[in-house]
């Protein structure tokens, strides 16, 4: 099944509008290219509606939030909704500051999102309007573990039902859920946390996958999460004694570029709940 989702990205090569952050914008663009889609990175309010119109999907990331881009995100999101385009939200660091929390919640109120992708702290912040986010990493009390997986899945399904979006909670164990079904994904490698922007890259990748698979947002988002985790595993095997996190970042992008749909199908490690 995930092979089909990935093959559709390669065949259709959707154009993805990214309003993302300046820390990871280059990596996000290269990740979109690596999977077979095409990126546009445009965040000026004067043009975002035009850019969104010519694209197939929209990825909104609040990582380096400022007052100028807030307007751009809202305008692009509403335009994408009017056009029926899928929209992904990455609420980076929601809960770490009042501005981030207020903006993430405002976006959720004013834009219909196809997928919401974040760590457990960020997603809990969206659900409650307040949080205990530690930087842009999940708070230690908010790690998804085997012991609390059932409750985390129930939370993800409930939030998906409330928002109408697929909810992708990523961490050591990833959860991708709609109101009725959840994928619990165990791909990935711990070293992925040593690179800034793997989550941002995943959100851009997710936008490409859901855009190429209309009507199948849950499966497409799960396929993207599996692909990113599998790329982390493949990339780690390439590391030599002299390689560090910069090499690892490049190897992850290379792994997506070289990954076949069949390789994803075989390597995806998940269960359905």
State where each predicted segment sits:
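Glycine-rich phosphate/adenosyl-contacting loop at the front of the ribokinase-like
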Residues: 1-41
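Buried hydrophobic packing segments
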Residues: 28-31, 203-210, 221-224, 252, ...
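Active-site cofactor/substrate anionic-group-binding motifs, chiefly glycine-
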Residues: 31-89
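Glycine/small-residue-rich loop that forms an oxyanion/phosphate-binding "nest" at active or ligand-binding sites
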Residues: 69-118
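Conserved phosphate/ATP/ADP-binding segment of small-molecule kinases
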Residues: 100-182
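Short pre-catalytic strand/loop immediately N-terminal to key active-site residues, enriched for Gly-Thr
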Residues: 185-196
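Conserved post-catalytic alpha-helical subdomain immediately downstream of the catalytic base
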Residues: 196, 206-248
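Charged C-terminal helix
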Residues: 230-273
């Amino acid at each position: 099944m995930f092979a089909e989702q990935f093959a559709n990205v390669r065949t259709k090569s959707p154009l993805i509008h990214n309003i993302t952050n300046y820390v990871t914008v280059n990596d996000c663009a290269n990740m979109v290219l690596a999977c077979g889609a095409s990126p546009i990175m445009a965040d000026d309010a004067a043009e975002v509606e035009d850019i969104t119109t010519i694209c197939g999907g929209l990825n909104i990331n609040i990582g380096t939030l400022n007052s100028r881009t807030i307007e751009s995100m809202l305008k692009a999101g509403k335009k994408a909704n009017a056009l029926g385009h899928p929209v992904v939200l990455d609420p980076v660091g929601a809960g770490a500051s009042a501005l981030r929390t207020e903006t993430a919640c405002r976006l959720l109120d004013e834009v219909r999102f196809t997928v919401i992708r974040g760590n457990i702290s960020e997603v809990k912040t969206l659900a409650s309007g307040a949080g205990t986010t530690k930087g842009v990493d999940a708070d230690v009390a908010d790690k998804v573990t085997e012991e609390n997986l059932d409750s985390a899945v129930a939370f993800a399904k409930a939030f998906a039902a409330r928002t109408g979006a697929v909810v992708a909670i990523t961490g050591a164990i990833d959860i991708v859920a709609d109101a009725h079904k959840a994928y619990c994904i165990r791909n990935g490698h711990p070293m992925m946390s040593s690179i800034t922007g793997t989550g941002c890259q995943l959100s851009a990748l997710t936008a490409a996958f859901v855009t190429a698979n209309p009507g199948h947002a849950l499966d497409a988002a799960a396929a993207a999460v599996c692909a990113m985790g599998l790329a982390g595993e493949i990339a780690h095997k390439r590391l030599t004694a002299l390689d560090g996190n910069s090499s690892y970042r490049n190897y992850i992008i290379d792994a997506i570029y070289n990954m076949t749909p069949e390789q994803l199908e075989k390597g995806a490690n998940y269960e359905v709940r």
